[in-house]
Amino acid sequence: MKLRTCCISLMLLLALPLQAARIKDVSEVAGVRSNQLVGYGLVVGLPGTGETTPFTDQSFNAMLQNFGIQLPAGTKPKTKNVAAVAVNATLPAFTKQGQKIDITVSSIGSAKSLRGGTLLQTFLKGLDGKVYAVAQGSLVVGGFSVTGADGSKLVGNIPTVGRISNGAMVEQEVPNPFGRGDFLTFNLFESDFSTAQRLADAVNEFLGPEMAAAIDATSVRVRAPRDVSQRVAFLATVENIEFDPAVGAAKIIVNSRTGTIVIGQNVKLKPAAITHGGMTVSIKENYQVSQPAPFSGGETVVVPNSEIEVTEKDSRMFKFEPGVTLDELVRAVNQVGAAPSDLMAILQALKQAGAIEGQLIII
């Protein structure tokens, strides 16, 4: 009953008419983007939960050499309080030199836990190989790992991943094309020719004719002032213009792993009749002991005895007339007591029969 209520409520919610949206809610300015940074470093100060992998030892020796410490030849350091880690961060657009960003630290070796560790100075590089930030600091780890003397182990959450809030300082800014050219381009999050044209029409209605033009299903180009300060004020105005996005294409999204089914607003069915029955095959393997008669010279053996039981649920047939909506489809399927897996099978069969007006996407 709860499943039926949730499905019907979700369908009704999706069927509500679209509301006006601000431009910044459905699009982003081209060139105004974040960048990914990554680096390799060492976490020290671990309470014996580190590692002794070859690359960790090599990195540890290189660090000592940078500090002017040369180990005797053949010396193998014990690095159970050290772990090799990968450090990654996201550099937001317009982040300035000297500002700080959050980082995530992940073990890449056999360390059991990073709890209590400190990340040493680590260079964070971009795709071009340049250093844009430097990370360092004490980790905050949500998980834990405990090992007993008898080898028993208890692990909670993920102890090999930690975060450092404001753990990296930006040393170099990323060039941004925001202040260049005569136009600003807005890229829709969901490509749609109708929505792109409506966005351009809304800007032209607000600012004047020929100020905006839809380039394709994703991009809308808007004429903007060259002066940077005026451009900021101009963008602040444009991104708050409201318009009515177009209704998207009719789609049914099915997640075969979780059983989640999302049906879009415009999905309809052509005339069709459906019957769906469930068959269950149960195989039970029993073992019996065959005991020979006394003094017969036979051997005691174990003989398998299989029991196979087949049960089939009563199937019902229901018919859809032209123009049936998604709500009626869900109600009809729920009335026959179908589970989400049954609904997925029905939807796939309807699509193969050409009875669904829309896309069926299985993820």
Curated annotation (Swiss-Prot):
<dbReference type="GO" id="GO:0030288">
    <property type="term" value="C:outer membrane-bounded periplasmic space"/>
</dbReference>
<dbReference type="GO" id="GO:0071973">
    <property type="term" value="P:bacterial-type flagellum-dependent cell motility"/>
</dbReference>
<comment type="similarity">
    <text>Belongs to the FlgI family.</text>
</comment>
<keyword id="KW-0975">Bacterial flagellum</keyword>
<keyword id="KW-0574">Periplasm</keyword>
<protein>
    <recommendedName>
        <fullName>Flagellar P-ring protein 2</fullName>
    </recommendedName>
</protein>
<comment type="subunit">
    <text>The basal body constitutes a major portion of the flagellar organelle and consists of four rings (L,P,S, and M) mounted on a central rod.</text>
</comment>
<dbReference type="Pfam" id="PF02119">
    <property type="entry name" value="FlgI"/>
</dbReference>
<keyword id="KW-0732">Signal</keyword>
<dbReference type="InterPro" id="IPR001782">
    <property type="entry name" value="Flag_FlgI"/>
</dbReference>
<dbReference type="GO" id="GO:0009428">
    <property type="term" value="C:bacterial-type flagellum basal body, distal rod, P ring"/>
</dbReference>
<dbReference type="GO" id="GO:0005198">
    <property type="term" value="F:structural molecule activity"/>
</dbReference>
<comment type="function">
    <text>Assembles around the rod to form the L-ring and probably protects the motor/basal body from shearing forces during rotation.</text>
</comment>
<feature type="signal peptide">
    <location>
        <begin position="1"/>
        <end position="20"/>
    </location>
</feature>
